[in-house]
């Protein structure tokens, strides 16, 4: 029997939150704008695109038992990624990234919380 080839990725699977201001940003104040969430993370994004092109993929990452983790899992499965190798950390929050974009489309600031990735160790792999 021929061995089936697949691409495996080890790394981040985040929930991304992008906010784009509708006007010049005012520091230390609430700013009107548009907010959008989507699954992200460089490794996850690459594997998603390969899956959409018909390649077999498997993601090795970590998610928490939370809304973001469930969405990351469901979105990967929806495009055919093998998500069975995900480390589930019930006491951790899933990895997340936030970017604030100014009205011209340039990033003003970004922030990430990827502490959960510390659980991806050589012993786990």
What are these language model-derived features?
Residues 61-65, 87, 102:
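Short glycine-rich, polar/acidic loop-and-turn segments at beta strand-coil junctions
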């Amino acid at each position: 029997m021929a061995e089936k080839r697949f691409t495996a990725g080890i790394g981040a699977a985040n929930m991304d939150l992008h906010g784009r201001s509708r006007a010049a940003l005012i520091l230390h104040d609430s700013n009107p704008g548009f907010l959008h969430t989507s699954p992200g993370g460089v490794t996850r994004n690459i594997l998603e695109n390969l899956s959409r092109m018909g390649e077999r993929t498997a993601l090795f990452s970590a998610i928490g038992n939370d809304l973001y983790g469930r969405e990351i899992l469901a979105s990967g499965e929806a495009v055919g990624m093998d998500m069975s190798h995900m480390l589930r950390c019930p006491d951790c929050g899933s990895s997340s990234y936030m970017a604030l974009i100014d009205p011209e489309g340039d990033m003003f600031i970004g922030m990430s919380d990827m502490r959960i990735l510390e659980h991806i160790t050589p012993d786990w792999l």
